[in-house]
């Protein structure tokens, strides 16, 4: 028995050492970038937010070892990834791209086994481009699956679906102008769809405290579903598109959304928000670059 206990102890120690070796050193987190304060700064200007490219929509994996983002090349958005391997960050690698279709708004499922995105690709990937749907590819041992899978009719409509994020239980938040008329085609609303028994359920629109007759899209929901941050185009905004935030009340209702103010918003266009899994940083896009700021800015708006 003593011998078995000793062997078991050695296994535990070895396993712990293995995990310690695979963790990212604190200084190397976030692509080795110096951390921001309460004022947003451009993220990785030497590697991601380049002057001659238009970058937007970004997400880190929960373990911090993968960074996905969209970049426009020759007028066509593509999705790239930078990974932490062998104690260093790799060069950006194209995950999915096309000369015919657009691919953007990457976001990982809560378990990291799926990479979701939007695309105007045809159903079989060969015909003419169509409206934007939400699609995903699945993680394999050596990378990602080759053929995108449509997220299905509970999510996608005859019109456009944009940008998605997830609660820890797998509920998807996204935006769509599905069901609108030609006169209200720009009226995108934020929706949610629970994930149950291997499929997404019928969507629900968020209340009028979030959705209006204006454009609301690019929604990030906190994993505990206690707040949403989204882009809206409203007359009272500071720019063409601003980030707004709505907190959930103690009774489970979404409170009236607030403009996140001049700390975040400018006369430009702010969109594609994302908060890192450690809760430390808010990422968002502005006029062709990716920015980040301390997530403490969220608490100042409660």
List the model feature ranges, each with a label.
Residues 1-23:
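Bacterial Sec-dependent N-terminal signal peptides
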